[in-house]
From Swiss-Prot:
Keyword match Phosphoprotein: yes
Record organism: Saccharomyces cerevisiae (strain ATCC 204508 / S288c)
Ranges in a coiled coil: 36-68, 119-195, 255-292, 803-831
Miscellaneous comment as given in the Swiss-Prot or TrEMBL entry: Present with 2490 molecules/cell in log phase SD medium.
Record-given protein name: General negative regulator of transcription subunit 3
Protein purpose: Acts as a component of the CCR4-NOT core complex, which in the nucleus seems to be a general transcription factor, and in the cytoplasm the major mRNA deadenylase involved in mRNA turnover. The NOT protein subcomplex negatively regulates the basal and activated transcription of many genes. Preferentially affects TC-type TATA element-dependent transcription. Could directly or indirectly inhibit component(s) of the general transcription machinery.
Gene: NOT3
GO CC entries: CCR4-NOT core complex; cytoplasm; nucleus; P-body
Numbered residues of crosslink Glycyl lysine isopeptide (Lys-Gly) (interchain with G-Cter in ubiquitin): K535
Keywords from the UniProt entry: Activator, Coiled coil, Cytoplasm, Isopeptide bond, Nucleus, Phosphoprotein, Repressor, Transcription, Transcription regulation, Ubl conjugation
Phosphothreonine modification, residue list: T571
Amino acid sequence: MAHRKLQQEVDRVFKKINEGLEIFNSYYERHESCTNNPSQKDKLESDLKREVKKLQRLREQIKSWQSSPDIKDKDSLLDYRRSVEIAMEKYKAVEKASKEKAYSNISLKKSETLDPQERERRDISEYLSQMIDELERQYDSLQVEIDKLLLLNKKKKTSSTTNDEKKEQYKRFQARYRWHQQQMELALRLLANEELDPQDVKNVQDDINYFVESNQDPDFVEDETIYDGLNLQSNEAIAHEVAQYFASQNAEDNNTSDANESLQDISKLSKKEQRKLEREAKKAAKLAAKNATGAAIPVAGPSSTPSPVIPVADASKETERSPSSSPIHNATKPEEAVKTSIKSPRSSADNLLPSLQKSPSSATPETPTNVHTHIHQTPNGITGATTLKPATLPAKPAGELKWAVAASQAVEKDRKVTSASSTISNTSTKTPTTAAATTTSSNANSRIGSALNTPKLSTSSLSLQPDNTGASSSAATAAAVLAAGAAAVHQNNQAFYRNMSSSHHPLVSLATNPKSEHEVATTVNQNGPENTTKKVMEQKEEESPEERNKLQVPTFGVFDDDFESDRDSETEPEEEEQPSTPKYLSLEQREAKTNEIKKEFVSDFETLLLPSGVQEFIMSSELYNSQIESKITYKRSRDMCEISRLVEVPQGVNPPSPLDAFRSTQQWDVMRCSLRDIIIGSERLKEDSSSIYAKILENFRTLEMFSLFYNYYFAITPLEREIAYKILNERDWKVSKDGTMWFLRQGEVKFFNEICEVGDYKIFKLDDWTVIDKINFRLDYSFLQPPVDTASEVRDVSVDNNNVNDQSNVTLEQQKQEISHGKQLLKQLKQGKISV
């Protein structure tokens, strides 16, 4: 009875799907045929969306029935589900087309007429996509069969070795499907990059169809050499990316199948065995938790005082609770305090690593390698040392060692070895309180030494101020140290740039002043004892002049004092006696040199045949020898990557995507290589340069708009720039004064006068390399560059001047001066209107 009701429900859903698909297809056909009525098209799209929603709900019902073992006929469920998914894909395509902007890059590419090769490439790509989808559908159908076999094997009555054999066979089929999908995906990607000939794919099309249609036939024989002739591994980057994607997909499929098989194996066990496995798992979890807890407990060692040893994690908390207490929590010996205060952070980290690698039970107090030093700061800014036992890594980084303290330790290690030994002998018989005070004094000296080695700051707000809480003091200290470092770097950079631009070295006037060092020391140690500061300053006065010069660091911060001492007053008059030569050309000289080089390169057609690297070398040498390019030795890193050009790229022009740039450069280079026969043959025949130039232009006129724009801005030689500009002008493109926008009028002018014109325009923007469409756009003539006849300039350079009428040239120049720029454009506009 229940089975009959379920079958009736399935039939009812099938009927609804058939009706919904019929309605959907009728709406879809009307939508595709509707091209002139946008409102009707939008209404049909909303109707399609409503029908797809209904079909999606029915598809969810079918998916639930597919996973249920009550329904035997799963093939019909799969067919109806696939028909609904096809309708969903159709609607997705309709929705994507409706969301595309009218003049986006995709729409403009669609509007262009495709050549036969592009159409063939698109057809082959669609064919490969269909084959990949068909193999995916077959993969899903086999996965359904595998799930069925797994359900049968769960029960002892239906379990058999035949099911396992079928399952393994289906998995082998799925592995072959994935391999063929990977090869087709590689071919698809290579076709998109124009690295694979569509005809090669056509040659193996029959073999691919045979595999897709007949791979499960009994007499099927697979040919694994189908894709050998396509050379799919030519692009290693694409091959690696596709292989990585399919490897992750296979791993995901294997994990899913392993999980299903493990559930099947567990279900075969008896309840008693399952309970036994659960008990063993619980015991293992408890044992692991116990081991983790034991490893986190530090081993306490013998201390020199009755007070307990403070752990690493609680050391800073104890310091915050008792600000007035001694900074050393474990009363260590003064000798150990002095030794640990001059250790570097690296040594303490090295001592920590072996202790972490050993087990907690093997850590004993007698092993000296297991002891490490934890350096921290008290609220008044003095560092202290605590001897700790090995423990696990804390959640908070162990220690708050500042970079100034670490730097001063390395300096003081060399100049205070003798004073440290005397301090050890004098303080060995003192009480613990005296020892703590001595350690405090040594740490204060360390901070003063750090201040002496730090560039002076003119901002008084960066000095350390006392605070009530330890946390706020630590934060203020960290902020001051970071600000000091940033200010020092900024000051060093400014001084370095001043040095590069000045005629005399600035280190002569930047001699260090002991008074400034004294001010830095007193500013940093406002919170420390006064007697400690005085004692350190007295020790500093007793030092020899050589040591004082070693410790003094000028505020310039870039060069050492040795360089300053090497300078002698005798060398300065020699520099003054040298004749002063101008480093840079004036603006008029620069323009004259630029025009001269431009005329020379525009008339040299053989530069088009040179590789880009040779062109760049020639241009940079010419610019450097003519003093147009700066001869200063100092250059920024980004300047080293710039290509030398006679005309720089405008400020608002950004480079396109690397793939588009590579494609444009490749097309341009192919055209340049094809000019070899034209240029060399014309020179042998001694043809006129104007005829050679016309042949060159004719060769470049086949290029697309994007390549012309790219090479107008990023080509190396002036001749290439002139060629691109000439062809763009022939196609009625007009460029703005700043060179960041180009305008192309569509149709006739709607309004014009001497100042502006109004019409429909295509605007090419160089900041993002996109074309936008503007209706009724007002174009001011003052915003455009004046029109330049590049062909006449080239010919004036190359043609012999004996046959040129000088009077006509003068008349032309007089006309250009008399007629304004707006009138010239208006005249050209009228001519264009008449031609339209």
